[in-house]
Amino acid sequence: MDAGVKLRKPGGHMERPRKGTDAVTQSNIKSVGIIGAGQMGNGIAHVVALAGFDVAMHDVKQEAVDKARATIERNMARQVSRGVITDVDMHTALKRIGYAADLSSIGEADLVIEAATEDEAVKRKIFVDLCPRLKKGTMLASNTSSISITRLASVTDRPERFIGMHFMNPVPMMQLVELIRGIATEDDTFHQAKVFIESLGKTIAVSEDFPAFIVNRILLPMINEAVYTLYEGVGTVESIDKAMRLGANHPMGPLELADFIGLDTCLSVMQVLYEGLADSKYRPCPLLVKYVEAGWLGRKTQRGFYDYRGEKPIPTR
C-alpha cells in the first residue's frame, strides 16, 4: 500500500506517495489510535490509513467523529480526482479507519496519537483516562504544538514510551513532522517513532523539549507581532498580509495564516512561550486575546481577522 501523501504547501502540487512496507515492518506498529477528530486528528488519520495502518479514531463528541469521516472521504476523493491516489487506494484506506465515541476502541492500538485541543489540562486528563485501557506495549504520542512532552509523559504509566509528534496543518499536504523526546523517552521509542513517521512519507525535524519546539517558536512570535502591528495601527489587515506576501515572498500573510491555524491555538502557543520562557517579547497581543474572547477564532468559526461568511474573505479591520 502506498505511504502518506507529500505536498509542498496548502494548495501546492502533490507528489505520488512512496511505498512504506519495509518501514512498517521495522517499526512493529500495525495499528494506530487517534484521539481527537478535529482538523489535526482527521488529517493524521488520513495519511496513516493511506500508509497501510489500521486506524481507530476517538472523540468525545459524536458530531466531531461524523464530521471527520466526511472530511476524510472528501479529501481523499479530491486526491483521486488529481491523480495522487487511485480509487482503489481511497476505498482500501477508508475501510481501515474505524470511528468511535468510546475510548475503549483505542485499547489494542500499537501507537496512540493524542490530537486534542492545545490545552494542557485537557491533554493530561486524556492520558490519565487512557492509560488503564491500553495494552502494556502501546506507545503514546502527543501532537501538541507547544506543551512540554516531559510534563505530559509524567501523568502516564509509561513515560519511557511517550514522545512528541507534531504534525503540520493541513497534515495530508505538509511535509514536516517535529519529533520531540521527553526526558524519560527511551531510544527504542524514538527509533520506532522515527521509522513510523518516515513510513508516512514525511520528513522529520528533531527538536529538544523546549516551549513551542522549533516551528512555532519561530512562527507564532511573527504572527503575534503582525497582530501587534494591526493593534497599534501601523497597517490594516489587508496591508499587513500584502506586505508579507509580496515583500517577504510568504505564500500566506501572517493574519490569514493565523485564521487558518485558529486564533485560540495561536493564543495558547503564545501563552506557553510567555510563561515558559518568561520573556516579555512573547506576551500575547491584547487584540489576539480579545478576538479569542469574542469567539472569533478564524476560519473554523467564520470570523477572525477576516470574515468568511460571504463569497470571499473580507478583512475585519
Give the positions of each predicted feature:
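Hydrophobic packing residues within well-ordered alpha-helices of enzyme cores
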Residues: 68, 130, 152-153
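NAD(P)+-binding Rossmann beta1-loop-alpha1 motif at the extreme N-terminus of oxidoreductases
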Residues: 4, 13-75, 82, 133
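NAD(P)-dependent Rossmann-like dehydrogenase/reductase catalytic/cofactor-binding core
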Residues: 6, 13-25, 188-191, 198-209, ...
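Rossmann-like dinucleotide-binding cores of NAD(P)H-dependent redox enzymes
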Residues: 57-91, 179-190, 204, 211-219
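Rossmann-fold dinucleotide-binding core
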Residues: 139-208, 213-217
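Rossmann-like NAD(P)-binding element
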Residues: 78-139, 147
